[in-house]
Design a protein with these regions (language model features):
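Active-site cofactor/cluster-binding pocket
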Residues: 1-139
């Protein structure tokens, strides 16, 4: 999120060459706040996935042609002792419904990104990732 508006990032996961980094309609959208949901909800392809941070967003999706997961990401992060881990919890929810990356590979990517200096945060991030997956599994 960004003061006064929304921030977004497009990620294309493919085992083929990517012709263009631009995404008009997405298979998956993660909305961390209401302005992002309002702006990007219609950009999910029919049959796609919308993951909503229900800790911050109270409204429900208006779409009936997509899968919607409501992830109480902030509460999950607090519950596992990683209060800054809402983004990792919601990533776990997304991966549960759209397993584009193996959980072990994602955990390894988090470890590498944290590096030695922040290695103490790895366990909290693992817990948030798994708890987010479990929350999505129940929906």
């Amino acid at each position: 999120e960004m003061r006064g508006g929304t921030a977004n990032c497009s990620v294309i996961v493919s085992d083929k060459d990517v012709a263009s980094p631009l995404v008009d309609k997405a298979d998956v959208i993660v909305a961390m706040n209401l302005p992002s949901l309002d702006k990007f909800e219609e950009h999910v392809k029919p049959g796609g996935l919308l993951v909503i941070n229900s800790s911050i967003i109270e409204r429900k999706s208006t779409r009936d042609d997509i899968t919607v997961v409501y992830c109480d990401a902030n509460r999950i992060a607090e519950a596992v002792g990683n209060p800054k881990g809402a983004n990792v919890a919601i990533l776990g929810a997304m991966l549960e419904k759209e397993p584009i990356v193996d959980i072990d590979k994602m955990t390894e990517a988090i470890r590498i990104e944290l590096g030695e200096r922040k290695a103490r945060f790895l366990e909290g991030n693992k817990k948030a990732l798994v708890a987010g997956m479990e929350a999505a599994r129940e929906q």
